[in-house]
Regions:
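A conserved amphipathic terminal alpha-helix motif
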Residues: 107-146
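Intrinsic-disorder/low-complexity, polar/charged segments enriched in Ser/Thr/Lys/Arg/Asp/Glu/Gln
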Residues: 2-10, 50, 59, 87, ...
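Residue-level signal for alpha-helical context at structural boundaries
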Residues: 35-37, 82, 140, 144
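Hydrophobic ligand-binding cavity/cleft-lining segments
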Residues: 1-43
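Hydrophobic-ligand binding "helix-grip"
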Residues: 29, 55-101, 107-109, 139
Length: 146
């Protein structure tokens, strides 16, 4: 079973600044509990960099495919053994002075036997996730409406 979902939200940052929030270290700023660990010891945005995250007692291994700050894009391979594996892509596009639209796409394949493991990334739930991300980024940026 495979799930491909995508969504968008707007942020009050230029695309060039916004992409920094979607790097392994940048997500520390706005994602509660996000604490990437680097087997090689040091953070890096280089292609091939491996980092690990944990959520709810489940570990996910990530590999940087590419972080292109000038192009305001990022791509990662990720695997959560026994659950799912796939690719995550982020693209930031300027929409107005100091504002950009963030596009996020997940392409995940089920590794286990329980299709429910992909539900969080299914279309309806993905929209909710994008809303949560939008609010979290806005709160980090100090938006009083967040």
């Amino acid at each position: 079973m495979r799930v491909q979902s995508s969504g968008q939200f707007d942020v009050a940052l230029s695309a060039g600044d916004a992409i920094g929030l979607f790097t392994p270290e940048g997500e520390r700023l706005w994602v509660p509990g996000w604490d990437p660990v680097y087997p090689e010891g040091q953070p890096s945005e280089d292609s091939g960099t491996v980092f690990l995250t944990e959520s709810g007692g489940v570990e996910t291994t990530w590999v940087v495919i590419q972080i292109n700050r000038p192009g305001a894009t990022a791509a990662y391979a990720r695997t959560t053994p026994g659950y799912h594996a796939g690719v995550v892509r982020v693209a930031c596009v300027d929409t107005a002075a100091g504002h950009s639209t963030i596009s996020v796409a997940y392409d995940l394949t089920l590794l286990g036997a329980d299709p429910a493991e992909l539900e969080a990334h299914a279309v309806g739930n993905f929209e909710d996730m994008m809303h949560e991300w939008s609010n979290a980024v806005a709160a980090y940026l100090g938006d009083p409406a967040a």
